[in-house]
C-alpha cells in the first residue's frame, strides 16, 4: 500500500463506543418518554460518540461531494444511456440544474462537484467544479482490471484530500455522491467480491435496463469476477477496488477514509456510494463508526447488500438517482438529531415529573 495512504489509515481513531451510555443517559433525561424519538435518538447518540463526548453536537457546516468518472464497461452494453451523459451531467451539476443541486439548496448543504475521471479532457473553467482528474475513465472490468493499483491509490488520496479540505473549512459532516454512466455494474461487482454475493441476486436495472438487458449485465459482471478472480482471491481490498471499481468510486472510498481521519460524520448515499463505503470499510474497518447509510436504494439488490453489511438505512423513499440526493435529505435528520440532544430540556430543567420506575 502507498505510504501516504497507509499513514492516513494508521492515524484514524476508532469511534469511542464507551460514550454511548452517557449519551443515552442524557437522552433518557429529556422531557419525553424514553426512546420515543426512535432512530433520532440513535443518531444523536452516535454523533455524541463521534464528537468524543463534546457538546454541543454539530452537523453544520455540511457538504456533499458529487464525484464523477467514466467506465470502460459502458462498451459492454450495460446501460441504456450513452457514455457522454456523464460529462453532460457534470455540466448540469455545475450550472445548478440537477436533482442534487435542488436538494442541497433545500437542505442548506454545500455542494462540490468533482471531475475525478471523466472522458473528454478538461472541462471549461467553472467556479462550481473541482477539476482533479486522476485518469480519463477506466478499462472494462469484463476484460481485465479497471485501473492500475497506482491509479486507484491516487483516487483514494484525492478523496482523502477532499475530506481534509472540508475539515479545514470547518465542516462537521460530509456526504458522498456519484455520477458515472454504467457505474452500477462495477458497484455490483465490488459487492460480489467484498461480501460474497451472487450477481444474479443483486444485479438491477440501474438507469432503466429492460429484463433481457439485466440478464446480459449479470453475465458481464460474472465475466469481470472471473477475469479478475486471481486479484480478488489474493484478498487485498485496494487491489480489488482497482480491479473492479471506478475512479469516482475509489475517490468516494477515500472521502470516507478521510472523513474518519478528521473525525467527521459521513453520510453515505445509495447503491454506488455504499459500494465505496464497503471498499473503505474493507480497507480500514474503523471508518464504519463514522458512517451513516442515508437511504434504502430502490435497486433490487440493495436489501441483500444492507443485510450483508448488517446496517440500517435512515430513509425509505424509493430513491435510485444517486448524485448524493439521499445524503442531502438525510442531513435534515442528522441536524434534527443534534438539535434534540442540544436543545431539549431535561425533566429537572422544565420542572416536569418523570415516569415512575
From Swiss-Prot:
Signal sequence bounds: none
EC number: 2.4.2.21
Catalytic activity: 5,6-dimethylbenzimidazole + nicotinate beta-D-ribonucleotide = alpha-ribazole 5'-phosphate + nicotinate + H(+)
Entry-linked Pfam families: DBI_PRT
Keyword entries, A-Z: Cobalamin biosynthesis, Glycosyltransferase, Transferase
Keyword Transferase attached: yes
GO molecular function: nicotinate-nucleotide-dimethylbenzimidazole phosphoribosyltransferase activity
Tagged with keyword Glycosyltransferase: yes
Superkingdom of source: Bacteria
Pathway assigned to this chain's UniProt record: Nucleoside biosynthesis; alpha-ribazole biosynthesis; alpha-ribazole from 5,6-dimethylbenzimidazole: step 1/2
GO biological process: cobalamin biosynthetic process
Annotated catalytic residues: 323 (proton acceptor)
Described purpose of this protein according to its UniProt entry: Catalyzes the synthesis of alpha-ribazole-5'-phosphate from nicotinate mononucleotide (NAMN) and 5,6-dimethylbenzimidazole (DMB).
UniProt similarity note: Belongs to the CobT family.
Name under which the protein is recorded: Nicotinate-nucleotide--dimethylbenzimidazole phosphoribosyltransferase
